[in-house]
Amino acid sequence: MILLDTNVLSALMRRHPDAAIVAWLDGLPPESVWTTSVTVFEVRFGLELLAAGRRRQRLEEAFAMALEEDLEGRVLPFDQAAAGSAELIAARQRRAGRPVEIRDVQIAGIAAARKATLATRNVRHFEGLGLAVVDPWTA
């Protein structure tokens, strides 16, 4: 299972997505590609902050299409299992003097609870968290 982080999903919403990311994604079984409820929040929040207009409308349509057609509703929630994993990750990182941003630790918790690989360009945000991480830009 691959979880798309916010930056990967956002990159796919561009008018002309990076060919390397598209090729990487096309090489995966569609049913193995998921995202998280935290990522959905981050994208929707970003869209809400945009001024009304054609750009926002196009991005909202691209996001809806990504969720409905590309991911076919494959969105994992931040549930009890994810919260349990996130709590352990956050506490371990805080004790080590390397606190993690709350949304990143929630995404990490979801990935850890599902034993999923996280696809992100921000590999350094997730280093040392005990997750399998892949950067689609360099994969």
Where do the PLM segments sit?
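Residues that scaffold the ATP/ADP-binding catalytic core of kinase and kinase-like folds
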Residues: 11-12, 24, 46, 85-89, ...
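Residues at the C-termini of beta-strands that transition into short coil/loop
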Residues: 37, 79, 137
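A generic structural signal for short hydrophobic patches within well-formed alpha-helices
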Residues: 9, 40-43, 83, 126
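Active-site phosphate/pyrophosphate-handling residues
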Residues: 7, 20, 44, 84, ...
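Short, well-structured N-terminal submotif of metal-dependent ribonuclease cores
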Residues: 1-35, 39, 48-66
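Active-site neighborhoods of divalent-metal-dependent phosphate/nucleic-acid chemistry enzymes
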Residues: 45-51, 69-118
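Acidic, PIN/NYN-like endoribonuclease modules and their adjacent C-terminal/linker elements
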Residues: 108-139
